[in-house]
Amino acid sequence: MKLAEALPSQRVLRIGLLAAGVVAVVATLALGGWFWYRSQESRGLVALAEASNLAQQAQGPGATVEARERAIKALEAVVSGYPRLSAGGQAAYQLGNLRYAAGQYPAARGAYEVALAKGVSGTVRTLAAVGIGYTWESENRYDRASAAYEAAARSTGSKDFLYEESLMDLARTQELGGKPSAALDTYKRLLKEVPGTRRGSEIQSRVASLQSRPAK
């Protein structure tokens, strides 16, 4: 065989061997990455369990400020140390609750937003959205609180108890924000969309009070 004829076949062989080597390396890296991820996930879940236990103790009767700070630091470590943790959103939500209880409203809001960004779903998602509203309301930012409560109501259905709570929160902040007409509309909406509401008498009382106010 002439040299010119042999070169193409040798190149094909080398390319094939190189490709096989690359595939083997990629497979090894992928396997190693999977094991690393599983290891990180396991450690993260253990850390979250420990932090959640501290959080539960910090929210119990007779809990001290020091206990709450320990729980906050533990949850902060989980959120920052395990950014890919499957339950990272749950950790951020718990962190938001503790920060809110400590009066750290901007920090609590940030934690709730992280929980939403990490894809928490169902009840926790709605609670995180409501939590954002609570932080704005605590700062007397009623327009922003109303927007957060309305977003929370949109994230659930009328048969969910959190839908009712979100609309009640919305109406309250509308009243506090000097928008009685909007609050009245929200209360009426709640009576229409949740006719069997357990808070019917309370809502009717608010409706009567708002309707009795002199028009401005």
Where are these regions (language model features)?
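N-terminal positive-inside, membrane-proximal cytosolic segments immediately preceding the first
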Residues: 1-25
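Short solvent-exposed coil/turn linkers within tandem alpha-helical repeat scaffolds
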Residues: 79-88, 102, 116-125, 153-162, ...
